[in-house]
Amino acid sequence: FTQPCLTAMEWPEKRLTVYGAAFSGPEQPEGFLTGFTAPADGNIHIGLLHGEVDPAEARYNPIRREEIAASSLDYLALGHIHKRTEPLTCGKTICAWPGCPEGRGFDELGEKGFYSGTVGDDGRISLTFIPFARRRYEILTVDVTGREPRAAVEAALPAETALDLYRILLTG
């Protein structure tokens, strides 16, 4: 999407309409979803938006839960938050942030991946999280009181850590 307004792309043969919008600057204080309602035309309606739900400060496409419910979208795929959320249902709309597919630093900890969505025969969307990252960023606190530090760290590390990156905090 290239325009700073909600734009539709249609695939009639799949009964699918996808809506999205692009930021025209570093911030987007007005919400793209405000006043939008998908038509009741029997199609699957999916939104792709970079934004924040119920933000305290409106800087990056603020989206209110009431707007999500009023949108009548079947699924709203959200970006901006790099930490995965569990799917949230607002009205009939399911939405979620998958996070990012690969962590880039110690401010993006844990398992990373994406959501795979399925449209059922009844039109309902189901989401499954698919781990994707080759490595994880983790912070590990190790108490070394009365222990040899290296042995304590090695004992605290999970078995599968060869590709993972750890910030290790020693206490004690």
Tell me the role of every PLM-derived stretch.
Residues 1-118:
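His/Asp/Glu-rich metal-coordinating catalytic cores
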Residues 5-14, 96-162, 167-169:
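Binuclear metal-dependent phosphoesterase catalytic core
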